[in-house]
Amino acid sequence: MHQYQDLLEHILSDGAEKHDRTGTGTLSVFGHQMRFDLAAGFPMLTTKKLPFKAIVHELLWFLAGDTNVRYLQNNGVSIWDEWADANGDLGPVYGKQWRSWQAPDGRSIDQITNLVQMIRTNPDSRRLIVTAWNPADVEQMALPPCHCLFQFYVANGRLSCQLYQRSADVFLGVPFNIASYALLMMMIAQVTDLAPGHFVHTFGDAHLYSNHLDQARLQLTRAPRALPTLRINPAVRDIFGFRYEDFKLENYDPHPHIKAEVAV
């Protein structure tokens, strides 16, 4: 995945020093874009080991419309714990917006259901969009959405996805985001009888925290390895019917994990 290594190099060489909400400090670039063709393999970073289980369970949690960390904790995933309140609640974050966006007239809009239906019935639509950025709810969210809007595109029997990420923790968060949205694209492609196409990742503020710089430099000393293959149970035809056991990552041979502290 040279695309990710190139982004690390770009930030380290050209990034601007910026202050941030956490008080940690960052090197930051704006408006970067990466593109991954899923025909070349599943874009799971190989220059450090990623926890596939956490990526899958987080996406299933989003798709369930859940906003409490209990499901994640019950499955050994702790990535949202720092932001949860005493009851495990996060406020109206991703799952709420994806599955039950509240309209001013009181309607609840299920963006994922609408998206899948539109891909099936009107694949040339330019409105194949899901947004998690709800200005009316942002102040009630434990963490406003970083990966905040995505759009699908159908051409020549292939389904592609572009993600806009307003804020990107490039060392810790972005590898998760790449794999998560590539997985979502493959799932939706399966239930709409399409082949996976390209995942396009567009960034607003893409940054390395000041306490991740040494880790990024270490990662750049590692050569990317062949991408793994993701197998999905072909019997699942409902986007909300997937379970963790329906996914199998094959031939994943990453370099060792690199530890870094999350900025909260």
From Swiss-Prot:
Give the GO molecular function terms: thymidylate synthase activity
Where along the chain is dUMP bound?
R21, R126, R127, R166, S167, A168, D169, N177, H207, L208, Y209
Please state the pathway this protein functions in, per its UniProt record. Pyrimidine metabolism; dTTP biosynthesis
Cellular compartments annotated: Cytoplasm
List of catalytic residues: C146 (nucleophile)
Question: What EC number is given for this enzyme?
Answer: 2.1.1.45
GO BP term (any one): dTMP biosynthetic process
Tell me one Pfam family matched here. Thymidylat_synt
Enzyme class, top EC level, equals transferase
Q: List keywords of the entry alphabetically.
A: Cytoplasm, Methyltransferase, Nucleotide biosynthesis, Transferase
- In which domain of life is the source organism classified? Bacteria
Record-annotated residues binding (6R)-5,10-methylene-5,6,7,8-tetrahydrofolate? D169, A263
Q: Catalytic activity annotated for this protein?
A: dUMP + (6R)-5,10-methylene-5,6,7,8-tetrahydrofolate = 7,8-dihydrofolate + dTMP
Stated role = Catalyzes the reductive methylation of 2'-deoxyuridine-5'-monophosphate (dUMP) to 2'-deoxythymidine-5'-monophosphate (dTMP) while utilizing 5,10-methylenetetrahydrofolate (mTHF) as the methyl donor and reductant in the reaction, yielding dihydrofolate (DHF) as a by-product. This enzymatic reaction provides an intracellular de novo source of dTMP, an essential precursor for DNA biosynthesis.
Among NCBIfam families, the record links this protein to:
PRK01827.1-3, PRK01827.1-5, thym_sym
Q: Which HAMAP family match?
A: Thymidy_synth_bact (MF_00008)
Enumerate the PANTHER family for this protein. Answer: THYMIDYLATE SYNTHASE, THYMIDYLATE SYNTHASE 1
State the name under which the record lists this protein: Thymidylate synthase
